[in-house]
Amino acid sequence: MPKQIEPVALDDAGSALVIVDQTLIPNETRYLRLTTPEETWEAIRSLRVRGAPAIGIAAAMGLYLGVKGSEAADFEDFYHEFRQVKAYLASARPTAVNLFWALDRMEACLLRHRDRPIPEIKEALRAEAEAIREEDARANRTIGEYALSLLKPGMGILTHCNAGALATAAYGTALAPIYLGQERGYNFRVFADETRPLLQGARLTAYELMQAGVDVTLICDNMASAVMKNGWVDAVFVGCDRVAANGDTANKIGTSGVAILARHYGIPFYVCAPTSTIDLRCPTGADIVIEERRPEEVTEQWYAKRMAPEGVKVYNPAFDVTDADLITAIITEYGIARPPYTESLKELFRRKEEAERRA
């Protein structure tokens, strides 16, 4: 795992959300201290913190900080303030379900403690936010173990966007088996799509993997077919921002194209995600809201000067949906789901509920 990367955490005093500003990597590693809902909202919206699990963690911690200073004297007034902050943070980005899952979990915690004094409710909210982070770290490693069971030493792996330590609490999702394999001498060869237009693969994945000593080769998105045709790719691993009940999966724009290429070349295509990213209330990928972002991200953001004609129309969706029938398996902390996903995903949640009852 990359050394000294802690993308999202509360400080020891519980007075600030500390994030690494991912818009500056790989040229600079700068930590930001966020203390207000407005700062947390901006960090999520601007991708200073990104990756579905990390967004959920940041939202939970930002919600706690948003009500920590409340002077409400009774529960109803405190709950009113809480709901306002929750709704505001929920508006930061529409696609990653972890954002809404984490905020809903914080509200459930508050309601469980509604008969407690306000200071005790605040402490319970802090503990819940910390628990979300700790659980994600454990899930990362377990996902990595399940995914590693599908691989052999020396394999070539292609990944898209960034689903590593920067996107989660620990090892990541799609990169977790790569890190575990590196620790055990598997010596994987990794191809990282640059992931236009925001270059998460070039800026973040290549950076992470190099920090960990992994053999990584950066490629342009339109080179994926070439490396697959050359026989250099044995498996594709990606993370995701939302899985629908039928297995359709929303992930960074370009993922669907990679899945189609993998199907053509007979390469298994795996999605790695914690169960918090699976939304059984969402029937299919058609029901997932796809975020659209600023045209400038395509035309000029990473260039010394503008690289497209002034006034040209730009379509800039942040995500696309990979159809379930293109996905070989969905790997979670409760096991590996295979088609038909309408059944296997429900089975994962049955296992999860059983594990929670035993805990």
Swiss-Prot record:
Reactions the enzyme catalyzes: 5-(methylsulfanyl)-alpha-D-ribose 1-phosphate = 5-(methylsulfanyl)-D-ribulose 1-phosphate
Record-listed substrate binding positions: 50-52, 93, 200, 251-252
Any one GO BP annotation for this protein: L-methionine salvage from methylthioadenosine
Site, Transition state stabilizer: residue positions: 161
EC number: 5.3.1.23
Keyword terms of this UniProt record: Amino-acid biosynthesis, Isomerase, Methionine biosynthesis
Molecular function in Gene Ontology: S-methyl-5-thioribose-1-phosphate isomerase activity
Record-given protein name: Methylthioribose-1-phosphate isomerase
Taxonomic source organism: Symbiobacterium thermophilum (strain DSM 24528 / JCM 14929 / IAM 14863 / T)
